[in-house]
Amino acid sequence: MPTIQQLIRSERYKLKKKTKSPALKQCPQRRGVCTRVYTTTPKKPNSALRKVARVRLTSGFEVTAYIPGIGHNLQEHSVVLIRGGRVKDLPGVRYHIVRGTLDATGVKDRKQGRSKYGAKRPKE
């Protein structure tokens, strides 16, 4: 506990909040170009081939982003939109690719939770 004299000499300083998605630079989304599209395996209790892409952003960062949904059309030089949000079982993956925007098409034959995967409403 500081004395009153110590507080007069130098005031208390605010703790800086550490952002969970620094590459977005305080923006909700960022555009980027895929430099590599590949699959990777998750952490210990889980087993799968998760689809991820290495993306060079307009902010100058190069990040690893997860490609959600079943099937995708992304390849090298595809232009994608990135949002924040980590994948718990993939270390170092702190971003998601937004489906249904720019070069990333929506998930085909998706009936429920369509807005998260950029799928249009199916015709009756």
Curated annotation (Swiss-Prot):
Cysteine pairings via disulfide bonds: none
This protein's UniProt keywords: Methylation, Ribonucleoprotein, Ribosomal protein, RNA-binding, rRNA-binding, tRNA-binding
Tree of life domain: Bacteria
GO-annotated molecular function: rRNA binding; structural constituent of ribosome; tRNA binding
Any one of the GO CC terms: small ribosomal subunit
Compositionally biased spans, kind Basic residues: 113-124
Chain residue ranges for the region called Disordered: 104-124
RNA-binding is among the record's keywords: yes
Pfam families hit by this protein: Ribosom_S12_S23 (PF00164)
Sites of 3-methylthioaspartic acid modification: 89
Bilayer-spanning residue ranges: none
Entry keyword annotation includes Magnesium: no
InterPro entries attached to this UniProt entry: NA-bd_OB-fold, Ribosomal_uS12, Ribosomal_uS12_bac
GO biological process, one term: translation
Family listed: Belongs to the universal ribosomal protein uS12 family.
Complex formation: Part of the 30S ribosomal subunit. Contacts proteins S8 and S17. May interact with IF1 in the 30S initiation complex.
Physiological role: With S4 and S5 plays an important role in translational accuracy.
UniProt name for this protein: Small ribosomal subunit protein uS12
Organism name: Picosynechococcus sp. (strain ATCC 27264 / PCC 7002 / PR-6)
Name of encoding gene: rpsL
